[in-house]
UniProtKB/Swiss-Prot annotation:
Sequence similarity: Belongs to the hunchback C2H2-type zinc-finger protein family.
Name of protein: Protein hunchback
Compositional bias per record (Low complexity), positions renumbered to this chain: 32-41
One example GO MF annotation: DNA binding
Cysteine pairs bridged by disulfides in the record: none
Region (Disordered) residue spans: 16-54, 152-192
Source organism of this protein record: Drosophila tanythrix (Fruit fly)
Residue stretches spanning the membrane: none
Major localisation: nucleus
Keywords for the protein's UniProt record, in alphabetical order: Developmental protein, DNA-binding, Gap protein, Metal-binding, Nucleus, Repeat, Zinc, Zinc-finger
GO CC terms, sorted: nucleus
Amino acid sequence: WYSSMFAANIKQEPISHHHHHHHAHHSHHADSNSNASSPHQSPLPSPNPPSNTNLQLEQYLKQQQQQQQQHQQQQQPMDTLCAAAMTPSPSNNDQNSPLMWSGLPNPMQTIMPANMRPSPTAATAATTTELCAPTTTTAAIALQANDKLQALTPPMDVTPPKSPAKSQQSCAEPEKEHDLMSNSSEDMKYMA
């Protein structure tokens, strides 16, 4: 998904680079301070996206990277859709991102952990809704699946490395909680 997102950005970047070039240049100094709240800096309809898009995109990317490591197939369809739907926002802001990173490091560092700690799902869902409304349903489904998968991941990780007897003990309780898991992990243990 990473490469698809960047490929899409790179394809669009030369286009937006040309008609953005002078604009970005002459507003570099004027807007470097007020950039977060300057609507004309960004071609997007609403005044917020220049800061929100990058801020939330950063959150979104970090979360996607974490989730991706755990279950790639689950993530793939959503990433592709979101990358396609989101590409216009990040790529239009690409020229501005140097300003953004310098203008926003503090809000980003404070807001991100705050948002991600209490409920990553809510943060991602909000981000997804704002950045690519069409894929909200897909995102919501994938997020629910992610939650299940993340809940099921620990027993899964425990089962294969240990001997069948040990893994049966260590997994007995999680299996009671996770009906979905119990069938497959018991099969694995008895097969092993």
